Amino acid sequence: MFPFERQNKIIHLLDQNNKITVPELSRILDVSISTIRNDLSALEESGMIKKVHGGAVLLKSEEKFTNFNDRIIRNIEEKEAIAKEAATLVKNNQTIILDASSTALALAKELHGFSRLTVITSGLYTAIELKDNPNISVILTGGIVTTNSFTLEGILGANLIENIHADLCFMSAKGFTMEEGLTDFNIYETELKRLLAKRTNKLVALLDHTKMGVISTASITTAENIDLLITDNKINKALYKKFQDAGLPVKIAE
């Protein structure tokens, strides 16, 4: 059983039982206690559950909403600096892709001065931010709405994505290393990001310093496929040099 299948079963069990213990999950799913703990950590990180002593409970709807809003304000100065730098790459008449990350939402706020711009996004907040701008056309990718992150997930919109071509794709992730590339914890969102990353002339990674050197559950794309990485000025100097030595273009937003 794949991790995402196991984690879906955990969510289903919690939905039925409100709370469940680690030993119970280990017995029901026939895996080790350490595997269950890893699954619970991944689910908590994605905003689906809350770990409690000896087990886990589902988050209430209002807690899930707060979870995404917490992400928006976390490292907000760094995200805003990255967004402003990213906006300098955008030109009128372009088609761009924005993922559903809070950093991409910060970039969306920088786009209101552009004209005849087409924005393809998997982020509901991003679409809402841009929807009333008459100079910007917004296309949602399609997929399943997840209340914890206000994101469209899955590949229900695969046919649409396969028929688009963007000038730029701006994408964030849970982590990045030269060895593993961009990685994220949400299997379904990662699947969608993989498709989007292939439909652009230029892939730009938007990553604040806390994402560097981090490896998460699922791979989005390799470092070789990234055309530019934009980060903030708190990036570890040794990592910055490693990226440069490997030939990865890096822009530091001030």
UniProtKB/Swiss-Prot annotation:
UniProt-listed Gene3D superfamilies: 3.40.50.1360, Winged helix-like DNA-binding domain superfamily/Winged helix DNA-binding domain
Pfam families: DeoRC (PF00455), HTH_DeoR (PF08220)
One MF annotation (Gene Ontology) recorded for this entry: DNA-binding transcription factor activity
HTH deoR-type domain span: 3-58
PROSITE patterns in UniProt: HTH_DEOR_1, HTH_DEOR_2
DNA-binding annotation, residue ranges on this chain: 20-39
Knocked-out gene: effects: Cells lacking this gene show a constitutive but glucose-repressible expression of the entire gol operon.
A Gene Ontology BP annotation from the UniProt entry: regulation of DNA-templated transcription
Superkingdom of origin organism: Bacteria
InterPro entries according to UniProt: Carb_Metab_HTH_regulators, DeoR-like_C, DeoR_HTH, NagB/RpiA_transferase-like, Tscrpt_reg_HTH_DeoR_CS, WH-like_DNA-bd_sf, WH_DNA-bd_sf
Keyword annotations: DNA-binding, Glycerol metabolism, Repressor, Transcription, Transcription regulation
Protein purpose: Involved in the glycerol metabolism. Repressor of the gol operon for glycerol metabolism.
PANTHER family referenced in this protein's UniProt entry, alphabetically: AGA OPERON TRANSCRIPTIONAL REPRESSOR-RELATED, HTH-TYPE TRANSCRIPTIONAL REGULATOR SRLR-RELATED
Protein's name according to its UniProt entry: HTH-type transcriptional regulator GolR
Organism: Listeria innocua serovar 6a (strain ATCC BAA-680 / CLIP 11262)
